[in-house]
Amino acid sequence: MLLPRRIQHCRVCGAPTVYRMPADDNRERAVCSACGEIHYENPLNVVGTVPVWGDQVLLCRRAIEPRHGLWTLPAGFMELGESTADGALRETVEEAGAKVEMQALFSVISVVRVGQVHLFYRARMLDTSLDPGPESLEARLFREDEVPWDELAFRTVRQTLEWFFEDRRLGSFSVHTGDIA
């Protein structure tokens, strides 16, 4: 079970918070000891793409922790003020320097243990020029039989790629959902 993030100070006035169950609620929340503001701790969204060029998918080798040196789809935390698709596109540009046309939402995976929801969109690469950013050691295209399956950074990436290649074999893409405890 996830240990919740602990909010220690009010985001409104800066006073210390205490954890208690507010009226008409069913769980403990961080409540400001001075102004009474209730602070909710919610999952973080990770957004990314499955960029495709012909029969190949684009993967990035991580230059940062966690999982430094392992391969992943271009993805990262969604920012305030952007849609999930906009965030996925931004991350694809930041991590791989890839130019893509965004397509449909492809997978939504809840990672309960760390309080995250991972959303991946299919994306069609417009060309093969790549310019990996500071969070990537390199970016490369892989056919299914070339994917470094034992060197993938995250279970959500493996699951998304497995679904993608299966759907491609079937000739029809759908939205996939799942949970990782």
Where are these regions (language model features)?
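Charged phosphate-binding loop/patch that engages nucleotide di/tri-phosphates or the phosphate backbone
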Residues: 168-181
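Conserved Nudix-box catalytic region and its N-terminal flanking loop in Nudix hydrolases
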Residues: 52-94
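A short coil-to-beta-strand element that immediately follows conserved catalytic motifs
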Residues: 20-21, 99-106
